[in-house]
Amino acid sequence: MAFFTGLWGPFTCVSRVLSHHCFSTTGSLSAIQKMTRVRVVDNSALGNSPYHRAPRCIHVYKKNGVGKVGDQILLAIKGQKKKALIVGHCMPGPRMTPRFDSNNVVLIEDNGNPVGTRIKTPIPTSLRKREGEYSKVLAIAQNFV
């Protein structure tokens, strides 16, 4: 038995390391960053027609590279590059801000006008604070959370 415990002695730390997570599980992994799959929630033709690959974020227009509600991102959708506005994400935020089941975006043009005419899901009321920037997106929203 002593031989058995002596044999596994150097490997106990290896098994201990392998049993724990060897990767980071921080909150930033749940926010929207590069290569995050998103869901388009407006009724634009580009966002509604089926495609074999989900839209992905390829750039976040922020210095730290992590997008939250109200930030602009660049999407790769059906072989095209389109700008989008984040209207909901899975990451828990500060108090009294909703957490969504999916990463929701609304397609916008380069000047900030929305591509679609309706938003199908509720959007957070925290976007109303930034009303000057996204007033046209708020105008086509039906529900607020």
Swiss-Prot record:
CDD domains: Ribosomal_uL14. GO terms for biological process: mitochondrial translation. Keywords: Mitochondrion, Ribonucleoprotein, Ribosomal protein, Transit peptide. GO terms for molecular function: RNA binding; structural constituent of ribosome. Residues 1-30 form a transit peptide. Forms part of 2 intersubunit bridges in the assembled ribosome. Upon binding to MALSU1 intersubunit bridge formation is blocked, preventing ribosome formation and repressing translation. Belongs to the universal ribosomal protein uL14 family. This is Large ribosomal subunit protein uL14m. The gene is MRPL14.
